[in-house]
Amino acid sequence: MIFIVVKFPIRPDKLDEWERAREEHTRGARSEDGCLFFDYSQSVDDPNEYVLVEAFRDDDAAVHHVNSQAFKDFVERMPDIVSGHPQIINAKIDQDGFGPMGEISPRQS
């Protein structure tokens, strides 16, 4: 699995444009074969920072995403929306998705 986390610093006056770009990018990515998950969240410390957590089945699926029209359109829009360089973690993980967390289980009634 290719696991990616990206932090996007967004210009406060561009939040509406960011929301549109983010929604279109998400729709496109989630429709791609090999996309395991693709989720954005807003930072609890900085309302102008958003974090993308995404994963792809393998290298081919990740390359397909980067070559997709949705990704290209998103990248083209970003220079006017971001306030700094997005920061990325990109790692290959020997898993194929989520598994159960051993430390927490639902309490039985």
Residue positions per predicted region:
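A broad, low-specificity signal for short, low-complexity segments enriched in glycine/proline
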Residues: M1-I2, I10-D16, N48-L52, I89, ...
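Glycine-rich beta-strand-turn "strand-cap" elements at beta-sheet edges
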Residues: Y40-N48, E76-S109
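N-terminal first-folded block
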Residues: I2-Y40
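An amphipathic, aromatic/His-enriched active-site/gating alpha helix that lines ligand/cofactor pockets
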Residues: E24-F37, A55-N90
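Short, well-ordered beta-strand segments in beta-rich or mixed alpha/beta enzyme
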Residues: I2-P9, D39-V66
